[in-house]
Amino acid sequence: MRDLDNLKEMIARHEGYEPRVYKCTNGYDTIGYGFAIKDLYMDKEVSDLILDQKIQQMLKRILSHEDWGEWFPGKPQAIKEVLIDMIFQIGFSGVRKFRKTIQYIKDDNFLMAG
C-alpha cells in the first residue's frame, strides 16, 4: 500500500487542506482536501464516528470550563445528557444564556429547571 500512501501525500500536498467550507475555483462548496460537498455521501458509520468525536469535544469543553467543570460532573446522568443534547443543538454559548435554568441545576432544583 506504499503507492497509496504516496498518492495520498501527493494529493494532500497539491490540494491543501481546509477544515472549513470554501468555494473552489469552479464555485462549488468544498471542504477538506478539495472534496466538493455536492459529491459527498456520509454513511452512518462515518456519521457515528463524527458524533462520537463531537461529544468528546463537548465534554472536554464542559469539564475545562471554570464554572461548569466544578458542578457538572456531580449531576445525575439524565441531567448531564440533557445538557449535552442542548449544547449539541444550540451550542455551549447558547445553553449558557439559560442562566436561571443553569442555576436551578447547580442547586439541584431539577423541577424548577425543567
Regions found by a protein language model. Name each.
Residues M1-G114:
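Acidic, aromatic-lined catalytic clefts of primarily extracellular/periplasmic carbohydrate-active enzymes
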